[in-house]
Design a protein with these regions (language model features):
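Transmembrane alpha-helical segments that form core, pore/gating elements
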Residues: 13-16, 45, 97-98, 134-196
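Specific alpha-helical transmembrane segments that line the substrate/conduction pathway
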Residues: 32-35, 39-40, 75-108, 112-113, ...
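Hydrophobic transmembrane alpha-helices of multi-pass small-molecule transport proteins
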Residues: 45, 67, 99, 112-132, ...
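Loop-to-transmembrane alpha-helix entry segments
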Residues: 54-58, 87-90, 106-126, 141-145, ...
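Helix-helix packing/entry segments at the starts of transmembrane helices
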Residues: 86-92, 162-185, 218-254
Length: 286
């Protein structure tokens, strides 16, 4: 039996959640992890999404930078700040969807979704008030937090782009994630060269991590996402995806013993609680 599109988006979020702990376990620089993961993800997506194998259209090319920003910047942020901060700050995406949706999609958030969006903004503020110290798994928290917010802006633009492309019904969303990973691999490598970031030599464990996060955490997850986005309003989809922040910090704690600041925990609880309430209300109306 085919899963409800909302459940598929929740499963997507659960797969995304495995990335934080896995990225921190990899010894390579963040930009290199992003680029190499993208190569594996592209191969997986071209296998799973036959409609993505044709050359991208001009519409698809417009959305590729948003894909690059959301995935590349998240990996970099995750190597600089805690997994909790990286994912919760990327989870500001619904704010940007709500701001851009009326103009670009003609979709306005429901009242319950606005409540969740306000809570997201308040939660985001708590992360920057925390003033966390550097640690082994979070060597530059402030810079990582800033990059994570920009990643959230990019992810919001990506969700808007998915919804926009999905209205045409031509499989262009599939092309975005497949070609977007090739775009990310190329641009990520160029960023490393431009910033003079040394390329590391992957260990056997690094290779296992890269293949796993490329094929499952990105490849399978985005295959589910592009099949579901045309069927769910953009703001609601972005809210459903925030099951990821509930799982991501937990996995980072279990694997690395990483403990986010208490104010970050409070911000995360505020966000997840609001999203859960908003999603339940939306479910009752459908």
């Amino acid at each position: 039996m085919d899963l409800d599109p909302r459940l598929r988006i929740l499963l997507t979020g659960a797969l995304f959640a495995t990335g934080g702990a896995a990225i921190k376990a990899c010894t390579l620089p963040g930009p290199q992890i992003s680029a190499m993961r993208a190569v594996v993800a592209a191969l997986t997506l071209f296998l799973l999404l036959p409609e993505a194998r044709r050359l991208p259209s001009a519409r698809v090319l417009l959305v590729l930078p948003a894909y690059f920003g959301s995935t590349f910047l998240f990996v970099v942020a995750n190597k600089l700040t805690t997994a909790a901060n990286a994912i919760f700050l990327q989870a500001t995406a619904p704010l940007w969807v709500a701001m851009l949706g009326p103009a670009l999609l003609g979709e306005r958030p429901r009242r319950s979704e606005w409540f969740a969006l306000v809570c997201i903004a308040l939660g985001m503020g708590l992360f920057f008030l925390a003033g966390e110290d550097a640690s082994a798994t979070a060597p530059s928290p402030l810079l990582g937090n800033i990059i994570a917010v920009v990643s959230g802006v990019s992810f919001g633009l990506l969700l808007v782009g998915f919804r926009w492309l999905g209205r045409r019904g031509k499989g262009e969303q599939s092309a975005v994630v497949a070609w977007g990973n090739l775009f990310t691999a190329a641009c990520g490598s160029l960023v490393m060269l431009a910033l003079d970031v040394p390329f590391g030599t992957p260990t056997p464990k690094d290779w296992v991590i890269l293949v796993a996060i490329g094929s499952v955490q990105v490849g399978c997850a985005y295959a589910l996402l592009v099949r579901s986005m045309p069927l769910v309003p953009a703001v609601q989809a972005s809210l459903l995806l925030m099951i990821e922040p509930a799982l991501n910090p937990l996995l980072a704690f279990l694997v690395h013993g990483e403990r986010p600041h208490p104010m970050a925990v409070a911000g995360g609880a505020l966000i997840v609680g609001a999203v859960t309430a908003s999603t339940l209300l939306a479910r009752k109306r459908t």
